[in-house]
Amino acid sequence: MRLPVMRVGLSLAVALASSAACASLGNVGSNFGLMPNDVATAQALSMFSNQPSAVYYNPAYLARDRKGALSAAFLFTEQELTAKGWKTPDEIVVDDVVEGDSNYNILLGFKTDLSKMLKDDRAIVLGFMLGAERTGLSLLSFNSAASQTAQSLKYGQQSLFLSLGAGLNIVPGFDVGASTRITLAADAKLSADAQVSGQTSFEGLQVAAKPSIQPVLSGNLNWGDLLCPNDKYCWAKGLETAATWRYESDYSANVDANALVPNLISNLPLLISTIDSYQPETFSAGIQYNLYKLRLGASADYQLWSDLNDRFKGDTVKNQALLKFKDVVIPRAGFEYRLNNVFSVLGGVSYEQSPLESTESLDVNYVDNDKIVMGLGFSYLIEKALFLSQPVRMDVSYQYHLLQDRDFLLTTTRNAAAGDC
């Protein structure tokens, strides 16, 4: 009999960098991890997770476990971001910028078995993930701005995260999956008659928002089931490999405003087009070996950040910065050790090279660093939890980002600070 499992998670993440945070081109799934196990292993084992977060990292793996699950997680991030003037001695700190903002996300996920829809006994499992910043208070937050001071490329607000997909077993040992990352594209039109004093009349405002759907495709191979399904001593038992492709995604906004000042200006247009929370097209590959008590895994992401060079040419907020990006490879390694039937320890590490080649970006002043991400977590399974009829799994994890020093030149065409984000 297959039993659904309810999971409750708590994640903690700490970041150390060299700038103040404001806008963000990252998302919670790529910066930290969706569920506590993803955070603990620095996403090294995320492609082989039986939790609902697989819908984003590797939807094919949903078919590996037919048990339904309902998951909830609380992700708290504390960023300590500092910058120091060039050639400033350590004992004389001038114009030191310290940003200690904290943030939190609520993440909900579920998966359910739909195998009864098929005539044969073939697994098909549906998964869903939802992430909202500050319990929904910043559900559709958007921030894209010029700045006279440094602003972090990846750290900052995390927009709404939404992903839906399914995994399907083709033959024993081979699964495929598809899912979608859903973002938002907003368009606004504004018109008004304005007076020199600032008063307006005959205002008109139209706002339209539509979802933008980006695909995720993946495949998973269990070599033991493929090569030697009936031999429990086969060398391939416990060996799995996976591959995933995720298309680029972002949140976008287009504003078309027009003002009329009678007897002075007949047409004053204002056109703004910008993107936020950009994630590049990504190819991922992973391998896992599952022993009696130990699970070892490694993965690598190839991220095509160079595509952002052309995207920013049409961004009216950032096009003057002439930002340059490069493609990067992110290696990860992680483990899970099962101490007994109910308690496990997880850990992982990754090295993330910065895709930002530019060390100077006029009026935008993006900064980013190479970093080492380290995670550690614990998992506890409660077979009989109070009034619940199903097992409950509790996960706690901690992640630390160690950012390497890097020099940037901050440039601006403004004479005085005004309206920085």
Residue ranges and their predicted role:
Residues R2-A23:
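Gram-negative bacterial Sec-dependent N-terminal signal peptides
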Residues A20-R122, E360, V367-D370:
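N-terminal, post-signal peptide beta-strand-biased segments of exported outer-membrane/organellar beta-barrel
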